[in-house]
Swiss-Prot record:
This is Large ribosomal subunit protein uL29. Pfam families: Ribosomal_L29 (PF00831). GO terms for cellular component: cytosolic large ribosomal subunit. One of its GO terms (biological process) is translation. It comes from the Bacteria. The keyword Glycosyltransferase does not apply. The keyword Zinc-finger does not apply. GO terms for molecular function: structural constituent of ribosome. Belongs to the universal ribosomal protein uL29 family. The lineage of its organism: Bacteria, Pseudomonadati, Pseudomonadota, Gammaproteobacteria, Chromatiales. Keywords: Ribonucleoprotein, Ribosomal protein.
Length: 66
């Protein structure tokens, strides 16, 4: 899990990459949950919140650029 401070030091491209990776991870976890293979449900929550953090920082950067 990355802290918001660490995310703010990254560029927009790096944040987009991170968002893509987290989205893929979320998809895998959702598939595991559907097939009953997911052991720790908290992983899904962690990834979902990380996605929200990245999106928040991306929005902040876009608003600063304007």
């Amino acid at each position: 899990m990355m802290k918001v401070q660490e995310l703010r030091t990254k560029t927009e491209d790096e944040l987009r990459k991170e968002l893509l990776e987290l989205s893929r991870e979320r998809f895998k976890l959702r598939m595991q949950m559907g097939t009953g293979q997911l052991v720790r449900n908290s992983e899904l929550k962690r990834v979902r919140r990380s996605i929200a953090r990245v999106k928040t920082v991306l929005t902040e950067k876009q608003q600063q650029a304007q």
